[in-house]
Amino acid sequence: MIKEELIVKTTALPQSRIALELEIPSNTCKSCVNETINSISRSAKIPGFRLGKIPKQVLIQRIGITQLHASALEKIIDKSWNQALKMESIEPLSEPELVDGFESILKFFNPEKPLKITLQTDIAPEFKLKKSKGLSVEIKKSKFDPKSIDEALEKSRNQLANIIPVNNRPAKLGDIAVVSFKGVYKDSKKEIDGGSSDSMDLELEKNKMIPGFVEGIVGMKIDDNKTLTLRFPEDYSHEDSRGKEAIFDISLKDLKEKELPELNDDFAKQSGNKDSLKELKKDIEKQLKENFDNTQKNIKVEALMDALSKELDAEIPKAMIDIEVRNNIEQTAQRFAQQGMDIKSTFTPELVKSLAESTRPQAEKNVQRNLALKALSEREKITVDNEEIDQKMKEYEDEISKSPKQIDIQKLKDVVRNDLLQEKLITWLEENSAVKEINEKATKLTTKTTTKATTKKGVKTKSKPKVNKKEKN
């Protein structure tokens, strides 16, 4: 007896999709029908018959031939689909779509005859770089501004300040005002979402709140009331409020001011655990310069990555971007969970939809960059060998030894491999591209902004990957 085999025909479709026409032999169809009957028989309960001993015809009569064929057809499609993927060495990016529809196929399904179906799916695109060497980019030339040291010291002074009450003068910039306020839209008189408070400590600094809010409080005395008519900026974070006029009724309930510590050796000991103010300034300068250099490095890398991405010749399928969006949301949820938040109540369908929409542009950019880097790796034959990975893994020996059961070594190695490869690719880009610096005024950097000077999707300098821990079942 000649064994019947699955026949597969593939057709390339636009937008990195592929169609697989399958001719499934009747012996596969009959086998799946019998498997389905046996599976149902093991759990079906029919009066007068023992469990697992129900005759085939009785079982078919009880559950119905259509239901039986539907269950079997799902098994046939799934089994044949996976077999076809292996035969053609295809790695799909999405679940298959049945071209003619399940109900239509079920209607004409006959296990005694071969079954012909067509499925479509997304696949990774064929990609290549139009150009890799000789890329040219322009970045703004910046130089370290010594004033940022004084700004860092002033920030530290504010953090260590004593808060004292104010009773005998009006509010001024730099004070801490305790205010109650209620805001409504001028046209509709509808209360503004998040635009009211019974008591809020507000540092009177420019650019806090919407334009005119802080300035309106300046000059008020305790127990004073004031009504302000203000306009939300066109780029305000809440879309419903953008450009709208609003009326705020404000009461000044209390007023405080900061008593700043003197800049001396005692301050150095309290602020940075240094013996002298001179030593503290030197330490701050070193940190800020390192952060400044890293920021400039990342600005250059960002420009080179954008230039490389533009050289990518590929049609990126929607499924790849969908996967990236989903991964980003899952990573955000994991961070929230680590902070003790209830994910089920926090990540509502509305929030997930909003996150998907807001992160999609960056996700598309990330996918394009990753494909461009992969294309560069293949084009220039840039790789990472096992010896390099093993050498890097030594940096994590202490952490691994502390919790060996919680750390997934293979995942950690994959992260290390990707990071090392990315470092090599970026170094290659820097060495084989032209970067022109355009003059600009000195850039001021604060400790807050510089400590977060990294680029998107892990493209950073001198980075150290996080240790991935195994998920608990």
Curated annotation (Swiss-Prot):
InterPro entries membership: PPIase_dom_sf, PPIase_FKBP_dom, Trig_fac, Trigger_fac_C, Trigger_fac_C_sf, Trigger_fac_ribosome-bd_bac, Trigger_fac_ribosome-bd_sf, Trigger_fact/SurA_dom_sf
Region (Disordered): 442-473
Gene Ontology biological process terms from the UniProt entry: 'de novo' cotranslational protein folding; cell division; chaperone-mediated protein folding; protein transport; protein unfolding
Chief localisation class: cytoplasm
Location relative to the cell: Cytoplasm
Keywords: Cell cycle, Cell division, Chaperone, Cytoplasm, Isomerase, Rotamase
Free-text note on domains in this protein's UniProt record: Consists of 3 domains; the N-terminus binds the ribosome, the middle domain has PPIase activity, while the C-terminus has intrinsic chaperone activity on its own.
PANTHER family: TRIGGER FACTOR CHAPERONE AND PEPTIDYL-PROLYL CIS/TRANS ISOMERASE, TRIGGER FACTOR-LIKE PROTEIN TIG, CHLOROPLASTIC
Name of the protein described by the UniProt record: Trigger factor
Name of the gene: tig
